[in-house]
Amino acid sequence: MIPLPLLEIIPYIILFIYGTIVGSFLNVCIYRIPEGQSIVKNPSHCMTCGNRLKWYDMVPVFSWLILGGKCRNCKAPISPQYPLIEAANGLLYLWIVGVNGWNAQSLVYTLMASALLTLSIIDWRTYEIPVQINLFLAALGILATILDVPHLVSHLIGAAAISVPLWLLYLLTKGAAIGGGDIKLMAACGLILGWQNIVLAFLLACILGSFIHLLRMKLTGAGKTLAMGPYLSAGIFVTALYGQTWIHQYLALLGM
C-alpha cells in the first residue's frame, strides 16, 4: 500500500513533469518563432550539425544533464537555456497550483504562464513580442471570461484599462515610448485578469522594470531602451496569484 503522503505528492510530481514537457516545446517556440520557422513541422535537431534528435535526447532536463550539455553527434555545446526553461516552466506550474489549487482557473494560468515565459525570452532578445503569442493569450482571455461570467464586465474593462492609455501614448509618441506588442499583451491579459488586477500588474511591472533597468544601466552600461515584456509578464503572473489578496488587504487598511 502506498502511504497517504506519497499519494498526495504524486499529482504534483506528474504536474511538474508535464510542465517540463511543455517547457521543452517552449524552447522550440523561443528559437523558431523569431526566425519565422514552423514550430510543428520541422523535427527537433542539433542547432550546429543539424542531426535529428532521438526521443531519448529530448527528455526534459535529464537529457541535457546526461549528455553533459553537448550534442551526442557533434559534441557541440547545448545552451543551458533548454533545461532552465523546462525546469522553470515545471516550477511555475507547481507554484500556480500550490497557490490557486486544482481548478479551471489554474489551467488558464498555467497556459498563460508558459506564454509569458516564452514571450519574455523572445522580447528580451529581439525587443519584439510575437503576435502569435498575444493571440494565444487573447484566446485564453476569452476562455477566462467564459469561466467567470459573473465578473464579465471586469474582464471586458480589463482588456481596455491599460491597453487604451498605452495605445494613446503610442500614438502621441509615434511608438517611441511603448511598443505595439506591449499594448496587445496588456489587452489580452487584462481580459484574463480583470481590470483591478491588470492595473496592479502594470504598476508592479513599471516599478520592477525601472528598478532593474536602472541597475543594469549603472552596472553593465545597458542603453536606455528596455524590453518591457519580461517586466509586464512578471507583474501579470504575480498579480494573477496574489493580486486580489493584496487589493483586499489594501482596501481593509483604508477601512473600505
Where are these regions (language model features)?
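Functional transmembrane core segments of multi-pass inner-membrane proteins
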Residues: 106-210, 214, 249-256
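Transmembrane helix-loop-helix
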Residues: 96-108
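Residue-level signature of transmembrane alpha-helical entry/exit and packing/kink sites
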Residues: 8-16, 82, 86, 105, ...
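Interfacial loop-to-transmembrane junctions
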Residues: 215-238
